Amino acid sequence: MAEQPVDLSDQALADAVSAVRRAFDGASTLEDLAKAKTEYLGDRSPIALARQALGSLPKTERADAGKRVNVARTEAQTAYDERLAVLRAERDAAVLVAERIDVTLPSTRQPVGARHPITILAERVADTFVAMGWELAEGPEVETEQFNFDALNFPPDHPARSEQDTFQVAPDGSRQVLRTHTSPVQIRALLERELPVYIVSIGRTFRTDELDATHTPVFHQVEGLAVDKGLTMANLRGTLDAFARSEFGPQGRTRFRPHFFPFTEPSAEVDIWFPDKKGGPGWVEWGGCGMVNPNVLRACGIDPEVYSGFAFGMGLERTLQFRNGIPDMRDMVEGDVRFSLPFGVGA
């Protein structure tokens, strides 16, 4: 059966556009509109068939008919685009209504944490020494025995080198340890920096201690080192007194007791005046200090006849205990946010 010829008259094209408009306007959802588009703008739609029929017209009629078909197609496409925009706007409005948030409802409070007091104290200590013109220095936590012991004048048979005191890093014979103090940072500073040197190092250290009220196997140390011409114990004492006042207020006082450390000579233990000591006010041990041992200076290529230096070190956990009256060091490592909150985010 022969196909019926396509009517390309103005009326036929106008009727086709009207049918398209009715179909698109009648679509109430985007899915309905997509189906209508396939039917009225697809390859078998009346307008598409009219475009295909242009080739069968005489050349004299083809140009005029082509213009009229293109106008009809443009009008049909415009009708689709307009309805598509309307349906999309309705969909988006419905989504906004469905997903709206009632701002009058009570909020769900999220728990708020706080920076750990050791972190806060470390920043305070750093600020104190930077204000005095010192520099911050850092070093690795996994150290060689050369920096952790040898360069600090520890003899080969010193008990601190044993596995009873120091965490050894496998494999055996690697001569690597978890640093037992931040003193290796001082050696690296003397080897890498120009003199004079005034540095403070703050970081984690590791020893094989049992966790109890006054000890922890992982703790934080602050150590200071000054190497310059003409430094004496008086400079050391003045520095530590200033440090004590910055942490403990005007009542912060120190005293020295003779002691022995391999890397300082003479050496002393530093006591801090503790008004709230159990049993009444008194002195409690705070840290160690002394003049840098000449052997340590020589190991770093520094002439001890020209330069002298002093060093000191103390634990941040112990300092926090004294400063804030914390009886049990275990509270600092158990991660309970209730311990950190009283110190405040900016304490």
From Swiss-Prot:
Among the entry's GO cellular component annotations, what is one? cytoplasm
| First-tier enzyme category under EC | ligase
Q: Which cofactor does it need?
A: Mg(2+)
Task: List, in alphabetical order, the GO biological process terms annotated in this UniProt record.
Answer: phenylalanyl-tRNA aminoacylation
Protein EC = 6.1.1.20
Q: Which InterPro entries match?
A: aa-tRNA-synth_II, aa-tRNA-synth_II/BPL/LPL, Phe-tRNA-synth_IIc_asu, Phe-tRNA_ligase_II_N, Phe_tRNA_ligase_alpha1_bac, Phenylalanyl-tRNA_Synthase, tRNA-bd_arm
Q: Which UniProt keywords apply?
A: Aminoacyl-tRNA synthetase, ATP-binding, Cytoplasm, Ligase, Magnesium, Metal-binding, Nucleotide-binding, Protein biosynthesis
Write down the species. Answer: Mycolicibacterium gilvum (strain PYR-GCK) (Mycobacterium gilvum (strain PYR-GCK))
Task: Please report the name of this protein according to its UniProt entry.
Answer: Phenylalanine--tRNA ligase alpha subunit
Q: Its family?
A: Belongs to the class-II aminoacyl-tRNA synthetase family. Phe-tRNA synthetase alpha subunit type 1 subfamily.
Q: Where in the cell is it found?
A: Cytoplasm
